[in-house]
From Swiss-Prot:
Protein family: Belongs to the Ycf4 family.
Alphabetical list of Pfam families matching this protein: Ycf4
Main location (coarse class): membrane
Disulphide-bridged cysteine pairs: none
Any one GO cellular component localisation term in the record: photosystem I
Function: Seems to be required for the assembly of the photosystem I complex.
Stated name of the protein: Photosystem I assembly protein Ycf4
Membrane topology value: Multi-pass membrane protein
InterPro entries, A to Z: PSI_Ycf4_assembly
Compartments, record wording: Cellular thylakoid membrane
Length: 178
């Protein structure tokens, strides 16, 4: 990399929180399936509780449906983690005068490319509260703001400010929102 190129990697869905949620949903789904089968067969398949005492038609059947729903949700979560949806890079190239924003999508990669001269400012947005938002985005001429930071867990304020200031300094544009 030369001094005229800045490349930032963006973390996708391969985060610890996503792994923990997918594992919890998977374990819960297996638990519901075993409880449903215990109710149907009349034998305890779980090492705790006494699910064989459940009546199959209302309770066991509903637990079986919960296990199907959990299996579908867990499959989706593990697929999103395997594909690493949302990961990608932000590439700012002064030599060629191009900004390339690329992300991995569900079916195919998403790539946005536009001239460097269209960048008017770097915007740092901080909103605390119930629906907190902390992100760095590009203000573009004739387009809406283009977010650059990852989705999910908000970045620490110091890191957010540092990334925004570094990018604004590199591009030679104003930093807005602080």
């Amino acid at each position: 990399m030369s001094a005229a190129v800045l490349e930032q990697s963006v973390l996708g869905s391969r985060r610890l929180s996503n792994f923990l949620v997918a594992a919890a949903v998977s374990v819960g789904g297996v638990g519901f399936l075993l409880a449903s089968l215990s109710s149907y067969l009349g034998q305890d398949l779980l090492p705790f509780g006494h699910p064989a005492a459940l009546i199959f038609v209302p309770q066991g059947l509903v637990m079986g449906l919960y296990s199907i729903a959990a299996a579908l949700l867990a499959s989706y979560l593990w697929y999103v983690i395997a594909v690493d949806v949302g990961s990608g890079s932000n590439r700012f190239d002064k030599e060629s005068g191009v900004v390339v924003i690329s992300r991995r999508g569900f079916r195919r990669p998403v790539c946005v490319e536009f001239p460097l001269k269209d960048v008017k400012a770097v915007k740092v947005e901080v909103r605390d509260g119930f629906n907190a938002r902390r992100r760095v985005s590009l203000r573009l001429q004739g387009r809406r703001d283009l977010p650059l930071t990852r989705v999910g867990e908000p970045l620490p304020l110091a890191q957010l400010e540092q990334e925004g200031a570094e990018l604004a300094r590199f591009l030679g544009v104003n930093l807005e929102g602080l």
